[in-house]
Amino acid sequence: MKIKPMAMIAALLWAAVPMANASVQVGFSPEGSARGLVLDTIHHARHTIDMMAYSFQSADIVQALVDAEKRGVVVRAVIDKKRNQGKVSQKAIAFATANGIDIRLDDHYHLQHDKTMIIDGDTLETGSFNFAKSAEFANSENVLVIRGEPGVVAQYQAHFDSRWNIAHQHD
């Protein structure tokens, strides 16, 4: 099926237009808009960030989380245990935990493959974007940020809470 250029443009413009009380933003990598959207979403957090991550390696994203923690935002993360045993991940985990971020490791599944943040109980960031340098600069990835959809955010919060409760505290 061939998509007409005008239909594509209309779809892209519609994706960032607020709908009633809801708004949706999208970003892609390696073009840079995915990374920028993730960082911007973290930057605007006021109270809480609950993150689920397969890869926890990206220095700029970890720094943004630490900066949020220093602003008084409570940051919690559930990350895949097996994926994050290498030096880069261990350095990121050590830096994050030394700066107040509460990290739990999940090894209950073949992969803890979620890539999601719930921010302030009203914003959801999700997509294929791993929190790793390869997602920023090498892979074809996507990010979706939804605001003003409390039912959707509540479902993701329940999913996060279930993973948080079964994951192990990082030593």
Regions found by a protein language model. Give the residues of each.
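Bacterial N-terminal signal peptides that target proteins for export
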Residues: 1-8
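Signature of lipid phosphatidyltransferase scaffolds
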Residues: 36, 119, 124-171
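Bacterial N-terminal signal peptides
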Residues: 9-16
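A general structural motif
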Residues: 29-34
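Primarily the HKD phosphodiesterase
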Residues: 40-101
